[in-house]
Amino acid sequence: MNQDYIFNIRITGILIENNELLLVQQKLSDKRNWSLPGGRLERGETISQGLIREMKEETGLDVEIARMLYLCDVAASSNTILHITFLLRRIGGEIELPSNEFDENPIYDVKFVPISELVQYGFSENFIQVIKGGFSNAGNYVGDKMNIGLGI
């Protein structure tokens, strides 16, 4: 990671099918090993290109953006992370594990998890309520990532 950037832009996707949310398993912290798929935007990519690439790399799925849900941030000691979350639609592909060839933090599993079981995967009740509420306040800046229940 280049430390010269003031901001890192992280893009994540929410893909819900049959009342289940797509998650990836990777080491995040001592408390959580599951997260929404996504990653950093690379130089020369649009947000859409970056998210479509990350979803394909991490999950094997082809997606399209349905709508932007939230823009939030996390102030870290080294730099600020701008975190943009989108609602997605699957347009093709099958779930498959990535090669992890170039990943510093490998993905060990990819699966759909019932929304009712997200707490068991380290997600907050607040985040579950955001999903069940149909993403009220979608399309807005919500401040710290904790405000939508996505803090670690």
Segments predicted by a language model, with ranges:
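A structural signal for short, well-ordered beta-strand segments
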Residues: 13, 68, 86-88
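Residue-level preference for beta-strand/loop junctions
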Residues: 5-7, 32, 80-82
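Active-site-adjacent beta-strand/loop module that shapes the phosphate/pyrophosphate-binding cleft
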Residues: 74-97, 111-114, 130-134
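Nudix hydrolase/Nudix homology domain
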Residues: 31-34, 103-152
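Conserved Nudix-box catalytic region and its N-terminal flanking loop in Nudix hydrolases
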Residues: 20-57
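Short, charged/polar surface micro-motifs in flexible loops or helix N-caps
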Residues: 16-21, 29-30, 42, 61, ...
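A short coil-to-beta-strand element that immediately follows conserved catalytic motifs
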Residues: 62-70
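Conserved N-terminal beta-strand and adjoining loop/helix that marks the start
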Residues: 1-22, 37-40
